[in-house]
Amino acid sequence: MARIAGVNIPNNKQIEIALTYIYGIGRTRARTVLSAADIACDMRVKDISEPELERIRSEVAKFLVEGDLRREVTMNIKRLMDLGCYRGIRHRRGLPVHGQRTKTNARTRKGPAKSITR
């Protein structure tokens, strides 16, 4: 197994798919990284040489991935909550942030339904 950005990449998958195991890299960014490193997208990880892996590592290092990206997202949400803006309040209350309805649905975000006893 190759190791890129602290993540073990599966050997028997195509490199384009294998790169998506890294948090912050999807299919489009994987293609961008591979084209910049001059590597074919349909190669298997086990067929890639060490110099090619180094080129991929250097390209991936240019992006914010894994722990740094998670920290950045967490800090952005925390900043919104500290500002007290609408989105921050919605995050704080555990409600949907992007304008979805909450009279019905939104159970994933709000948690299990609380029964009202009379």
From Swiss-Prot:
Pfam family, one: Ribosomal_S13
Record carries keyword DNA repair: no
UniProt record, GO biological process: translation
InterPro entries assigned to the protein according to its UniProt record, in alphabetical order: Rbsml_uS13_C, Ribosomal_uS13, Ribosomal_uS13-like_H2TH, Ribosomal_uS13_bac-type, Ribosomal_uS13_CS
Region: Disordered, residue numbers: 94-118
Purpose of the protein: Located at the top of the head of the 30S subunit, it contacts several helices of the 16S rRNA. In the 70S ribosome it contacts the 23S rRNA (bridge B1a) and protein L5 of the 50S subunit (bridge B1b), connecting the 2 subunits; these bridges are implicated in subunit movement. Contacts the tRNAs in the A and P-sites.
HAMAP family from the UniProt entry: Ribosomal_uS13
Protein name in UniProt: Small ribosomal subunit protein uS13
Organism: Acidithiobacillus ferrooxidans (strain ATCC 23270 / DSM 14882 / CIP 104768 / NCIMB 8455) (Ferrobacillus ferrooxidans (strain ATCC 23270))
